[in-house]
C-alpha cells in the first residue's frame, strides 16, 4: 500500500512543482470553501473519533485537542485562506551573478518534492500541513494519530476533491488511514519517495524517527523551556511574563517548564511568585532551597523530582530552582534544555548579551515570553513544525523551510577553460 502511495506522491510532486502562485492559491481557496461546505461530514467523523477516545480513557485536555466544532472548522478554513496571502518562496532567486567564465549563475528556491509528516492527536495539523505543502509545490503523505483517523480521512477526502476540481492529482495529498503502527516503521524507510520527514508528537516518536528513518528527519517540538530571573529583573513585569509563558496555553511546546531564580532575590521574589501562580492554579515543583521559601505561600508547592527537569509538564505545573547566577543558569539549560525556547529576565545588558550568545536554543528571548516561538508570531504566517535542530531549518518552519534550492547556470555556448 505505502509503495503505491509513494509512487503516486512522487509523480504528483513533479506536477505540483510547475504550478504558478495563482494556480496554487486557487487550489487553497477551493480547499477552504470545501472544508466549510463539507463541515457536516467532517464533524460527524470527529464525533466518532471523540466517542472512541472517551471510551479509551483519554484526558479532558487531550479530548479538547481532538475536538472540532463549527467555529474551529471555520477558523481552520480561514487559516488556509491566510496561506493564500503569504508570499510564495518558490522560484525566488536567492543569489547569483555573472562569473569570469561568462556563465551567469543563480541559486533558486524550488520545492522539496514529497514531505512526510507523522503527527499525533491534532486534527488541524492535517489541513495546516497540506496547505503549506501545496503552497510550496510539494506533495504530502500524512500519518495522523489513531485517535483522529476518521477526522483525518474525511478532511483529506475534501482536500483531494478540491485538487481534482482544479485538474490536479489527488495524490498530491494522501493520508495513511490505517492505525497499524507497523506502517510507521515502513514509512520511515520510504527514502525512495519521501524527501523530508517531520514528526510532530512526543519524545518517543522523535526518538523512533531519528533511530529508524532512512529519510532526512526534522525533529523538534519537544519544549523543556526555561526562564532565568536575573538579580536585576523587575518583579512586576517578570511575574507577568512568567504567568503568560506558563498559563496562556500550558499544553504547547513553547510553554515555560522550569523557572531559574537568582538566589540573591529569591527571598523577596518567591513569595510574589507564589501569589501569582496561586491565582492561576499552578503547582510549583521546587528544589530544597526554593521550597523552604515557598512553603508558606498560597500556591501548592512540592519537592521537585530530579527527572522533572528533563520532561515537559504540558500542564499547570512549574519547576523552580535557585541558581547562584547566570553561569549556573546557562549550565542548567545546557544540561536539561531541548534547544527550543529559553528566556532571561534582566536589566543588565551584559547578562542579556551573554545569555543570547551562550544559550544554544532555536529561539532565545530577553525580557519576553517563550510563547512567541510560533510561525504566526514571527511573521512567517503558518508553520509546519518547530525545529530544534541546526541543519536545513531551525525554529518555526514556515514556507521557506519547505523548499530547497538548485543552482542554475546560463551560458552562451560556454565551456570550462
UniProtKB/Swiss-Prot annotation:
Keyword Zinc-finger among record annotations: no
Pathway info: Amino-acid biosynthesis; L-proline biosynthesis; L-glutamate 5-semialdehyde from L-glutamate: step 2/2
Compartment annotation: Cytoplasm
Encoding gene per record: proA
A GO term, aspect molecular function: glutamate-5-semialdehyde dehydrogenase activity
Family membership: Belongs to the gamma-glutamyl phosphate reductase family.
Superkingdom field: Bacteria
Keywords: Amino-acid biosynthesis, Cytoplasm, NADP, Oxidoreductase, Proline biosynthesis
Matches recorded under Pfam families: Aldedh
Keyword Amino-acid biosynthesis: yes
GO biological process: L-proline biosynthetic process
Role: Catalyzes the NADPH-dependent reduction of L-glutamate 5-phosphate into L-glutamate 5-semialdehyde and phosphate. The product spontaneously undergoes cyclization to form 1-pyrroline-5-carboxylate.
E.C. code: 1.2.1.41
The reaction(s) this protein catalyses: L-glutamate 5-semialdehyde + phosphate + NADP(+) = L-glutamyl 5-phosphate + NADPH + H(+)
A GO term from the CC aspect: cytoplasm
Name of the protein this chain belongs to: Gamma-glutamyl phosphate reductase
Record Gene3D superfamilies: Aldehyde Dehydrogenase, Chain A, domain 1 (3.40.605.10), Aldehyde Dehydrogenase, Chain A, domain 2 (3.40.309.10)
Amino acid at each position: 500500500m505505502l509503495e503505491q502511495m509513494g509512487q503516486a506522491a512522487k509523480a504528483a510532486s513533479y506536477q505540483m512543482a510547475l504550478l504558478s502562485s495563482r494556480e496554487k492559491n486557487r487550489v487553497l481557496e477551493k480547499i477552504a470553501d470545501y472544508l466549510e461546505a463539507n463541515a457536516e461530514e467532517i464533524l460527524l467523523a470527529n464525533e466518532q473519533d471523540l466517542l472512541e477516545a472517551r471510551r479509551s480513557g483519554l484526558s479532558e485536555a487531550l479530548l479538547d485537542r481532538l475536538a472540532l466544532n463549527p467555529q474551529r472548522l471555520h477558523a481552520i478554513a480561514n487559516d488556509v485562506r491566510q496561506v493564500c496571502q503569504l508570499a510564495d518562496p518558490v522560484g525566488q532567486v536567492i543569489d547569483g551573478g555573472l562569473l569570469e567564465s561568462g556563465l551567469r549563475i543563480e541559486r533558486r528556491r524550488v520545492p522539496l518534492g514529497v514531505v512526510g509528516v507523522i503527527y499525533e492527536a491534532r486534527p488541524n495539523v492535517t489541513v495546516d500541513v497540506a496547505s503549506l505543502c501545496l503552497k510550496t509545490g510539494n506533495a504530502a503523505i500524512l500519518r495522523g494519530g489513531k485517535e483522529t483517523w476518521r477526522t483525518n480521512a474525511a478532511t483529506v477526502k475534501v482536500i483531494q476533491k478540491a485538487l481534482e476540481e482544479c485538474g490536479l492529482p489527488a495524490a498530491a495529498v494522501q493520508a495513511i488511514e490505517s492505525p497499524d503502527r507497523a506502517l510507521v516503521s515502513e514509512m520511515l524507510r520510504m527514502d525512495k519517495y519521501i524527501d523530508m520527514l517531520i514528526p510532530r508528537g512526543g519524545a518517543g516518536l522523535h526518538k523512533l524517527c531519528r533511530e529508524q528513518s532512512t529519510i532526512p528527519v526534522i525533529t523538534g517540538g519537544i519544549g523543556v523551556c526555561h526562564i532565568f530571573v536575573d538579580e536585576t529583573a523587575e518583579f512586576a513585569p517578570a511575574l507577568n511574563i512568567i504567568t503568560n509563558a506558563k498559563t496562556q496555553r500550558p499544553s504547547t511546546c513553547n510553554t515555560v517548564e522550569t523557572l531559574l531564580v537568582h538566589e540573591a532575590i529569591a527571598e523577596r521574589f518567591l513569595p510574589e511568585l507564589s501569589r501569582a501562580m496561586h491565582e492561576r492554579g499552578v503547582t510549583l515543583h521546587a528544589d530544597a532551597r526554593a521550597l523552604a521559601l515557598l512553603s508558606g505561600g498560597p500556591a501548592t508547592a512540592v519537592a521537585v523530582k530530579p527527572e522533572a527537569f528533563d520532561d515537559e509538564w504540558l500542564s499547570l505545573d512549574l519547576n523552580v530552582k535557585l541558581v547562584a547566577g547566570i553561569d549556573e543558569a546557562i549550565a542548567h539549560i545546557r544540561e536539561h534544555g531541548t534547544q527550543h525556547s529559553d528566556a532571561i529576565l534582566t536589566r543588565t545588558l551584559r547578562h542579556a548579551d551573554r545569555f543570547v550568545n551562550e544559550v544554544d536554543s532555536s529561539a532565545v528571548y530577553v525580557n519576553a515570553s517563550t510563547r512567541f516561538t510560533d510561525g504566526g508570531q514571527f511573521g512567517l504566517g503558518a508553520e509546519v513544525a518547530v525545529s530544534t535542530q541546526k541543519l536545513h531549518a531551525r525554529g518555526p518552519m514556515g514556507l521557506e523551510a519547505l523548499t530547497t534550492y538548485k543552482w542554475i547556470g546560463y551560458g552562451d555556448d560556454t565551456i570550462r577553460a
